[in-house]
Amino acid sequence: IKKVLNQKILSINEINKIVDEYNLQDSSNLKIFIKDNPCKYDINTLYNIAELSNINRNETKAYFTREDIVFNMVSKLPAFDDRKSIKILEPSVGIRNFLPLLFKKYKNISNVILDVIDIDKNSLEISKLLLEKTKIPKNFIINFINEDFLIWENEYLYDLVVGNPPYGKVINEKNLLDSYKAISQNKETNNLFSFFIEKAMKLAKYISLI
């Protein structure tokens, strides 16, 4: 506890200076930085650095969730105390994700299958590197899936879908929009969040998206 309390919390300006100094907008440099951790930052600081280094945020419509929002959201998820095995889906995992808190939430369930999806290959690879610095419970099996969730074909249903799906509209990509509408009830929208909610509702009884 003392070690955590003594950790310096970096401001956004300080993090941006680190991003510029190490040229972390380049995903290759960011991966090396996370792996080597030359400044010996704690895991939360590494997550923050990774988020602010993500130059693809606008391209993939990905926006990351504040820690306090994630904490409050996970605390209200069903406990599944009567279950020995559950399946969880995170359909747009990004970099700052729910995984560490899900580890704590479901540490007493014997078997947890956790499928994490992201359309951005670099975000998935960076997420993996960050998780390597986190103690993953033995009861968790994590499957990383580099796919577009909206057209991805699931093999089974889930007990829980949780995450922070992308916001924004599909513009100037008619073929992509047509493929989303083809598998959706709402044919009038081009909003990604709407498509995500509709598909998530087909996959699980419990849905928690923000």
What feature does the model see in each segment?
Residues 1-110, 115-134:
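Class I S-adenosyl-L-methionine
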Residues 86, 159, 205:
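Conserved acidic residues
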Residues 97, 121, 186-210:
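Conserved Class I SAM-dependent methyltransferase catalytic core
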Residues 122, 152, 168-170:
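Active-site loop signature of alpha/beta-hydrolase-fold enzymes
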Residues 138-149:
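Conserved SAM-binding strand-loop segment of SAM-dependent methyltransferases
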Residues 149-156:
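Short conserved loop adjoining the S-adenosyl-L-methionine
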Residues 158-164:
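Short SAM/SAH-binding signature in class I
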Residues 167-189:
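Mobile active-site "lid"/loop adjacent to the S-adenosyl-L-methionine
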